[in-house]
Structure formats: C-alpha cells, structure tokens
Amino acid sequence: YENTIYELNRKYEQDVKSMAFFHIPMSEFSTAFQLYTQGSPQVQYLFGAIGEPDDAISYPHKEDTMFEKMVEVGSTQAVFVGHDHLNNIGLKYQGIDLVYGRSIDYLAYPGIKKVKGHRGATLITLQKDGVYSIQPIVYHE
C-alpha cells in the first residue's frame, strides 16, 4: 500500500487521493463506533446505524497496521466494507470515512428477507478534483 501510493505520488507529481474497498471491516470500524457511542469528538457521525445484534462489528482479531499506515500516508479518504449485512453506518475517524455499504442479498441470515431497511446501495460520486460524496440509497420493495 505505502509503496504504491508513494510511487503514484512520484509518477503524477502530486499527492494522490485513494479509497479502499474490503469485504471484512478493519478493527478501527469497531474502535470508531465505540468512541462514537461514548460521545467522543474524535468521531464524526455521517449516516446510518449498526443493525447487527449486540452492535456487532465482525473484524479479524489480529494485529494489523493498515489503518495506521493509511492515516500516516494521508492518501486514503474513505474505506468501504460489507460483511455485516445489517450494518450501514458511516463514521469519520482520524480523517478517514469508514463506511458500511448496504446489503443487496436475501440469503445472508435466516429470515433476512423479512428485515426491512438494510438493503440498497452506496452511491459514491467522485469529482475530477478529488472531492467526493457518499449517499446511502435504501431499496424499498
């Protein structure tokens, strides 16, 4: 990650902006949500909610420095994830938007077809100058 970003910065003679897309959330999604629920000024609420039972955020429980490197390098503006099908929250933490995309499935959990409000899409609009917006779109049947 770091080498690629620095190589792109050199190639284009400017600091490139990036976004990351993963299936499984990073542990910082949980950290940011916990800080948000405690009212910490370190986290800015963007939209949505955690819908999984017990406010679950499923992430690998092993040491990882990817997020710290993203903050240090300063290129990554947003990280988009899925996995937890009932979560659809967006939070800004340490300058990076942490965003759960909406689910599109009917098969993830028993009875999920009866659950309303979690299906849809996340529209990312990116301008030529690097400015972007994120809009959650709820699918209504």
Task: Describe the residue ranges of each PLM region.
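His/acidic metal-ligating clusters that form di-metal
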Residues: 1-82
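Binuclear metal-dependent phosphoesterase catalytic core
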Residues: 65-73, 87-141
